[in-house]
């Protein structure tokens, strides 16, 4: 018997059908080993990780050991990325495999699977080292920084090497929006009647460069703009006709697939990845964790065949798209495995995502869309306020659909600016021609703040900043929302009070919050995978940096809200009657403070009477609570010093005869 070990049990049925008799397919169900849960699991100077079987891994490994007794050969067919390579290495270690055959395939089809069996290889230890470095770096930041973060804030909070920079982006965008000051400015639009078509076209006043500067592009004089809108006639200065092309977007990478699923289907990155995982396991799409925006060369023939069948024109030569900076391009873009299949998947999300993937992948090799473009420059026949004013009209008409015959545009964009551009049907004009203005309009404009991030646009930002990798985006989104650092309202992301507290506590104190540092770490991991850097050097550098920052912080930093009694951080605690602040040193320190606008307030001074305690001489306090469970008695203000004396109330005075 030949044993093939894969990651996901969802692939077993499909692979069993492909491989047939003589094969046993078993799943590791992800990682079987990890760093220990209750300790760091790695330490200087060698930073060698200490792994232990996960609770699920113990059962998986026991089952696999039994299967090994019947196996003649073992094929490790975990996923074709760094994570999959690491899982294969851990399986080799746990099962004590002396000569496992490592095979990978980018799609679960008979051709791809059988081709991989013909050319097995050994485990790529450089890629394993890169994954191990990522895991250890995440552990270092989490275990070294989180306790200090909790000390500073008085709350049990966690810091993350990638999640914290993601939260920072959301926090800074929110503050940018709140700090934004609206600028009211003005423009003018002229409208012209086209006698031949009975239509209307428009031209906008050009305020640059005569009326505004590059560093302050807003025209503020409303009266002058209104006068421009009253222009009655213009002279044509120039008229130009040209043709513009619009190329199709590339096929999906992991991040663009998540963005398109969010924008077009309304599903979050995690749901998109879950649907893609199922489609991959069912054999409908290629491997969906990739940053390569190009289809495989072998797919071109299939794309051309489907395009001809659909009556679509293909591009003159195969298209190649530029990969993002730092992309690993280890696997082709996300595409269908059987291009002629129009519908695939078991659920509505899977079917909708498959359709997006297929049409986008076909469109990438279709001909450009073409537009007829007309541009006319106009000048007012008479100066306005002694100044010559010019206008420009630009119109675009689709004359050849090309790839737009198949898909409407780039589904990753929240708003497709190209499609918003008006056709503006400008007639043929001759330089020197005088045109009458049908009507004018004063444009009252105002600047807009940047939009809040959505999960789609945050993924796009993370990718552009080089933060994270295809396999991590969905987990980042899920973590920052599920842990309460970011919340979603009508698809937009807002920081929570906790998220802002984390960012304020870490920024300026730890370098891993800087986007540039996070990007450098990703590049270091890439170099480890390529054999250009060593694991130990990368880990030691980050470890030393964190140690230095923690030492500096512990010497200089004080808690944001220190206890006035012991100096430990105060914590904001929900109570029956709202929030209050208590000392994190409880029960050793039981000081509390009222909550005032999310911050510790001042305790009201204790109101004492002129009556003295007969036991210790301290002033008495009149303690009254009305309603259910109420009370009315006198107590000693020396309670904390040990005097427990109480007195019954007698007509608003302590009854010294009834002392307890």
UniProtKB/Swiss-Prot annotation:
GO molecular-function terms, A-Z: DNA binding; DNA topoisomerase type I (single strand cut, ATP-independent) activity; zinc ion binding
Root EC class: isomerase
GO biological processes: DNA topological change
Keyword Repeat: yes
EC number annotated for this UniProt entry: 5.6.2.1
CDD domains (alphabetical): TOP1Ac, TOPRIM_TopoIA_TopoI
Stretches annotated zinc finger (C4-type): 563-589, 613-643
Gene3D superfamilies: 3.40.50.140, Bacterial Topoisomerase I, domain 1, Topoisomerase I, domain 2, Topoisomerase I, domain 3, Topoisomerase I, domain 4
Keywords for the protein's UniProt record, in alphabetical order: DNA-binding, Isomerase, Magnesium, Metal-binding, Plasmid, Repeat, Topoisomerase, Zinc, Zinc-finger
GO (cellular component) term, any one: chromosome
Pfam families from the UniProt entry: Topoisom_bac, Toprim, Zn_ribbon_Top1
Domain Topo IA-type catalytic span(s) in chain numbering: 124-550
UniProt key word Cell inner membrane: no
Reactions accelerated catalytically: ATP-independent breakage of single-stranded DNA, followed by passage and rejoining
Cofactor(s) the protein requires to work: Mg(2+)
Record: residues binding Mg(2+): 7, 79
Site residues by UniProt (Interaction with DNA): 31, 134-135, 138, 143, 289, 483
List of catalytic residues: 287
Residue ranges of the region described as Interaction with DNA: 158-163
Quaternary structure (record): Monomer.
PANTHER family referenced in this protein's UniProt entry, alphabetically: DNA TOPOISOMERASE, DNA TOPOISOMERASE, TYPE IA, CORE
Role summary: Releases the supercoiling and torsional tension of DNA, which is introduced during the DNA replication and transcription, by transiently cleaving and rejoining one strand of the DNA duplex. Introduces a single-strand break via transesterification at a target site in duplex DNA. The scissile phosphodiester is attacked by the catalytic tyrosine of the enzyme, resulting in the formation of a DNA-(5'-phosphotyrosyl)-enzyme intermediate and the expulsion of a 3'-OH DNA strand. The free DNA strand then undergoes passage around the unbroken strand, thus removing DNA supercoils.
Designated name of the protein: DNA topoisomerase I, plasmid
């Amino acid at each position: 018997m030949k044993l093939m070990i894969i990651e996901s049990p969802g692939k077993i049925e499909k692979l069993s059908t492909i491989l047939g008799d003589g094969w046993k397919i078993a799943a590791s169900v992800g990682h079987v080993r990890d760093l220990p849960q209750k300790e760091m699991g790695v330490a200087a100077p060698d930073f060698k990780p200490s792994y232990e079987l996960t609770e699920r891994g113990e059962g998986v490994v026991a089952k696999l050991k039994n299967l090994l007794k019947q196996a003649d050969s073992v094929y490790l067919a975990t996923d074709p990325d760094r994570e999959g390579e690491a899982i294969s290495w851990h399986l080799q270690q746990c099962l004590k495999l002396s000569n496992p055959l490592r095979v990978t395939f980018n799609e679960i089809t008979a051709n791809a699977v059988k081709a991989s069996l013909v050319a097995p290889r050994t485990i790529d230890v450089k890629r394993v080292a890169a994954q191990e470095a990522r895991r250890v770096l995440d552990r270092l930041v989490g275990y070294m920084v989180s306790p200090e973060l909790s000390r500073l804030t008085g709350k049990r909070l966690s810091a993350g090497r990638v999640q914290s920079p993601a939260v920072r982006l959301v926090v800074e965008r929110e503050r940018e929006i709140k700090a934004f000051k609206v600028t009211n400015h003005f423009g003018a639009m002229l409208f012209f009647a086209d006698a031949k078509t009975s239509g209307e076209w428009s031209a906008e006043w050009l305020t640059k460069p005569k009326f505004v500067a590059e560093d302050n592009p807003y025209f503020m004089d409303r009266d002058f703009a209104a006068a421009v809108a009253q222009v009655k006639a213009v002279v044509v200065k120039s008229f130009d006709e040209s043709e513009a092309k619009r190329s199709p977007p590339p096929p999906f990478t992991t991040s663009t697939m998540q963005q398109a699923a969010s924008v077009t289907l309304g599903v979050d990155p995690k749901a998109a990845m879950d649907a893609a995982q199922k489609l991959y396991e069912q054999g409908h799409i290629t491997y969906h964790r990739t940053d390569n925006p190009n289809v495989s060369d072998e797919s071109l023939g299939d794309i051309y065949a489907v395009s001809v069948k659909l009556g679509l024109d293909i591009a003159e030569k195969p298209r190649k798209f530029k990969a993002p900076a730092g992309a690993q391009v280890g696997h082709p873009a996300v595409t269908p495995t059987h291009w002629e299949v129009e519908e695939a998947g078991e659920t509505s999300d899977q079917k909708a995502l498959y359709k997006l993937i297929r049409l986008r992948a076909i469109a990438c090799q279709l001909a450009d869309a073409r537009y007829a473009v007309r541009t006319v420059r106009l000048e007012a026949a008479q100066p306005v306020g002694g100044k010559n004013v010019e206008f420009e009209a630009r119109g675009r008409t689709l004359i050849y659909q090309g790839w737009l015959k198949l898909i409407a545009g780039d589904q990753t964009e929240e708003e497709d600016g190209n499609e918003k551009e008006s056709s503006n049907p400008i007639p043929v004009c001759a330089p020197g021609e005088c045109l009458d203005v049908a009507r004018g309009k004063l444009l009252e404009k105002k600047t807009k703040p940047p939009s809040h991030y959505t999960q789609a646009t945050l993924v796009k930002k993370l990718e552009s900043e080089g933060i994270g990798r295809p396999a991590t985006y969905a987990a980042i989104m899920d973590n920052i929302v599920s842990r309460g650092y970011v919340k979603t309202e009508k698809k937009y992301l807002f920081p929570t009070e906790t998220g802002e507290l984390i960012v304020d506590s870490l920024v300026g104190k730890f370098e891993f919050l800087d986007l540039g540092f996070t990007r450098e770490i990703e590049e270091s991991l890439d170099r480890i995978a390529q054999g250009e850097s060593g694991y130990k050097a990368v880990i030691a550098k980050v470890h030393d940096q964190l140690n230095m920052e923690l030492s500096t912080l512990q010497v200089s930093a004080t808690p944001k809200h220190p206890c006035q009694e012991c100096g430990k951080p105060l914590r904001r605690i929900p109570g029956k009657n709202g929030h209050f602040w208590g000392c994190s040193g409880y029960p050793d320190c039981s000081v509390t403070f009222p909550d005032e606008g999310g911050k510790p307030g001042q305790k009201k001074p204790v109101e004492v009477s002129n009556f003295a305690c007969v036991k210790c001489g301290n002033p008495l306090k009149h303690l009254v609570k009305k309603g259910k469970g109420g009370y009315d008695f006198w107590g000693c203000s020396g309670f904390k010093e040990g005097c427990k004396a109480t007195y019954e109330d007698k007509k608003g005075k302590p009854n010294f005869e009834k002392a307890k």
